[in-house]
Amino acid sequence: MAEQTHVLFVEDDDVIREATQLALERDGFAVTAMPDGLSGLEAFRANRPDIALLDVMVPGLDGVSLCRRIRDESTVPVIMLSARADSIDVVLGLEAGADDYVTKPFDGAVLVARIRAVLRRFGHASGPNSRPAEDSSAPDGGVLTFGELEIDTEGMEVRRSGQPVALTPTEMRLLLEFSSAPGTVLSRDKLLERVWDYGWGGDTRVVDVHVQRLRTKIGQDRIDTVRGFGYKLKA
């Protein structure tokens, strides 16, 4: 029997927490559900789940702070849950290291689809230390060099001026997408499709925040913004 995917779900609303836990368990997930951020952090450290769903407004340790604490310790995928798609909390969550977000109220099927999409691009097999899935757009084997930046496409490692750069799997997939076509402008919609596995329109803020996070790690001038079109990696 295949090992169940373990989901950490942190939500303070009892009705939402219990209903969502039941829906996820019916879909085959193992779920640890916690009502606040501090107990959520303890559960994360004790169980090392495969993915974390964090409500932004949980008490004790809010969802954004919890995401930041998790990201300090792990590259496990994180999805933020927010009652408002236009909330600054969404951007703060992405800046803290979240990989995606879902707006409340949400349909259970939509949430499950988003979870599975995130796990696919993380190459989920046996837990949070799994490497990103193979991507047909990624360059074939070897080390790519762009100035002081080196990308090992087989070892999934990045160095800047000889020093290792720690990237999350989503950041790595984004960099691989850029490096597969250096100098070519990639639209936000194309990046959502290729990196986030969206077969439909998504929130381009997800792309913008991840590009900015990537820039802080590989160099602000390595990725250019082409206003009105998208982004490109300097060849």
From Swiss-Prot:
UniProt cross-references to CDD domains, sorted A to Z: REC_OmpR, trans_reg_C
Record key words, sorted: Cytoplasm, DNA-binding, Phosphoprotein, Transcription, Transcription regulation, Two-component regulatory system
Keyword Transferase (UniProt): no
PTM comment: Phosphorylated by CseC.
Swiss-Prot/TrEMBL GO biological process terms: regulation of DNA-templated transcription
Principal place of residence: cytoplasm
Limits of the Response regulatory domain: 6-119
Functional description taken from the UniProt entry: Member of the two-component regulatory system CseB/CseC involved in the stability of the cell envelope. CseB activates transcription of RNA polymerase sigma-E factor, in response to changes in the cell envelope.
InterPro entries per record: CheY-like_superfamily, CseB, OmpR/PhoB-type_DNA-bd, Sig_transdc_resp-reg_C-effctor, Sig_transdc_resp-reg_receiver, WalR-like, WH-like_DNA-bd_sf
GO annotations of cellular component type: cytosol; protein-DNA complex
Protein name: Transcriptional regulatory protein CseB
Organism: Streptomyces avermitilis (strain ATCC 31267 / DSM 46492 / JCM 5070 / NBRC 14893 / NCIMB 12804 / NRRL 8165 / MA-4680)
DNA bind region: 141-235
